[in-house]
Amino acid sequence: MTILDEIAEYARERVKNAKENISLDEIKKKALSMPKGIFAFEKALKKEGMSFICECKKASPSKGLISPEFPYARIAKEYEDAGADCISVLTEPKWFLGNDEYLKEISEKVNIPCIRKDFVVDEYMVYEAKVLGAQAVLLICSILSESEIRHCIGICDELGISALVEVHNEEEIDMAVRAGARIVGVNNRYRAIVVPFIKSHKTLQGFLTSGNPKLRI
């Protein structure tokens, strides 16, 4: 079992526990009662030139503890002041020491779109992201089926938030495109050993732009 498999399995446990406190019907009703979003995340990435998604992350499996103090709200505000277009907020609690409250507070304090960076394994987490103030969610091809990605993108469209679909090979790119992805992120790391591999990004970027000119990367 890879680290990604372990994280995904733990995410399923998290969803199961969350549903015991707030049911799927309740979180769905709450999300749908909120004003529909305007797809601010993907709009922010459509500007001319390079766009920057800056990340608020306390820890990671490969680096361990990154920021012991972790003044996340201040970090997010400094990103915004420095010209960031969007902010990525880790909410995975075990391996990344994230917290849903980080996303909620940051989204209330900044005026740029926030993406919930987590390991979505259930539609529940998409509705939850909307309630927490996210304008986008991360969907990872390696832990979701094509039909699950399509379903989650459909929910995002209904809520007015964006889906950033993560891929790391050509097969996953094809899957993402078939599922209706409008924004694709290329993961530069081999899952099993967690080592950056920049060449893969350049290769896959070429594959994406040559065959799918409307996609944002």
Which role fits each region the language model picked out?
Residues M1-C114, V121, I155-R182, A192, ...:
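Conserved N-terminal beta1-alpha1 strand-loop-helix module at the mouth
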Residues V15-N17, I22, C141-I149:
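Amphipathic repeat-derived elements
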Residues E55, K117, I140, E166, ...:
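Generic beta-sheet signal
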Residues L144-G160:
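Solvent-exposed, charged amphipathic helical/linker segments at domain boundaries
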Residues Q205-F207:
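Flavin-dependent oxidoreductase catalytic cores
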